[in-house]
Regions:
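Hydrophobic core of transmembrane alpha-helices in multi-pass small-molecule transporters
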Residues: 14, 97-114, 308-322
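Transmembrane alpha-helix termini and helix-breaking/packing motifs in multi-pass membrane transporters
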Residues: 28-34, 87-92, 149-169, 244-245, ...
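Helix-loop junctions on the cytosolic side of multi-pass membrane transporters
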Residues: 121, 125, 167, 171-197, ...
């Protein structure tokens, strides 16, 4: 936790995450001013989701040719360059021509598809094994703090400045992040890389590592179910729920968002405080919180009282963060350091794909059936995940040798 390189990692990620939030805020402002169309705004999450999916899919090819630290720093540096090109286009071209903006958005999302697995895979290389829960909790708290603070700060900036100025601020944050990422050194001694194989085999490697290990396969089945269920918290569905079920103005969506992120932060702080205790009882805790999230989600869908909705959302965020940290720590503990980036690459590609598909599916259910049914359906998906985890989640962690040969 006190390692200089871990400090550079989380500081670099802090500036990158804050920049990512302000980048989205600035783009929303620019696109809406140019087109005043919900369709163009909807292109933002679509391009982000499938750009990250493509980046995660191709990450293993790069992993066999470059060091993990080089990929993380390179991703951030290239994002900074593409963002500068985007700023030049916005500054000197008519705002009505948006297709170059969409190309830049996709490229930045593609580069993010490298950064996410690289970041997660570097944590166990830069901290001691017994500090993993604490390190993951700390990184989670930093992320949620920048998300909560970034959206609030971004909303304030849009009132004062034009979207173009917000993008310039993002550029400055990206430059600072790039400098810090370049300073990270991974001193881990790894096994020699295996002999070269075809690009298709390289892409499949992480997927096969997950599928061929029983515990990893079980964990990722749960991740798929819970990713599908998490779609209910996107703005498009919450807006409808706030209007049709809670019968309050759309501004209440902001309170729900704040309550959820507050719960996430509280969950991260709780894991940070009680890391040692949690590491000894991971199985019991992760099963209990999974059941709790399922109950909270169904209850939220059936509830129509505003203050109860805020409490349920905050508790859901708290439990969700605890579960994420435990599952992430389990994966980092069980996989070898050589295999971990490939596993995270496949995982992030899978999450992006599932999330993108279920956004469309749940959006259609909210439109043509009932937004309440969306939350009830998500709750049942979470219940299935909790039941599956009760049977398949390992009772203990392996010590010593990694599970992959």
């Amino acid at each position: 936790m006190k390692s200089k390189h871990f400090r550079l990692l989380w500081l670099g990620q802090l500036f990158a995450n804050l920049g990512d939030v302000l980048y989205i805020v600035g783009l929303i402002s620019i696109l809406y001013a140019a087109k005043e169309s919900a369709f163009y705004l909807a292109m933002l999450p679509f391009l982000n989701t499938f750009g990250r999916f493509a980046g995660g899919l191709l990450f293993p090819i790069l992993l066999n040719r470059y060091r993990l630290t080089s990929l993380l720093a390179g991703s951030q540096c290239y994002k900074t360059v593409v963002l500068f090109i985007l700023i030049l286009w916005i500054s000197f071209q008519p705002p009505s021509i948006v297709w170059p903006i969409f190309i830049c958005i996709w490229i930045i999302a593609f580069l993010d598809g490298w950064a996410a697995p690289a970041m997660n895979a570097l944590v166990p290389r830069l901290v001691k094994r017994e500090e993993l829960v604490k390190a993951n909790s700390f990184v989670a708290v930093i992320y949620e703090t920048t998300q909560l603070g970034g959206w609030a700060f971004g909303g304030l900036l849009t009132v004062i400045f034009h979207g173009e100025h917000i993008i310039w601020l993002t550029f400055v944050l990206f430059v600072i992040s790039s400098i810090m990422m370049k300073g990270i050194v991974d001193e881990t001694s790894l096994k020699a890389k295996r002999k070269k194989c075809g690009k298709r085999d390289e892409i499949k490697e992480g997927w096969l590592l997950i599928w061929n290990n029983r515990f990893m396969r079980s964990i990722h089945i749960v991740i798929v179910l819970e990713t599908a269920a998490s779609v209910v918290w996107v703005a498009a569905i919450l807006y409808v729920f706030v209007s049709e079920v809670l019968h309050v103005t759309e501004a209440f969506w902001g309170y729900i968002n704040a309550a959820f992120f507050t719960g996430l932060m509280a969950g991260g702080l709780c894991c940070l405080k009680f890391a040692f205790c949690m590491e000894r009882h991971m199985r019991k805790i992760v099963i209990s919180v999974s059941i709790g999230i399922s109950i909270m989600t169904i209850w939220f869908g059936l509830n129509s009282i505003t203050w109860i909705a805020l409490i349920l959302v905050a508790f859901s965020g708290f439990l969700e963060q605890v579960k994420r940290i435990i599952i992430n720590t389990y994966i980092q503990t069980e996989a070898s350091l050589e295999d971990l980036p490939k596993i995270y690459s496949a995982q992030h590609a899978l999450i992006s794909l599932i999330f993108g598909l279920f956004v469309l599916m749940f959006g259609a259910i909210a439109e043509y059936v009932s937004v309440k049914m969306v939350f009830i359906g998500a709750g049942f998906l979470l219940a299935i995940a909790a039941l599956y985890m009760t049977v398949h989640f390992p009772a203990h962690f392996k010590k010593g040798a990694p599970p992959y040969s």
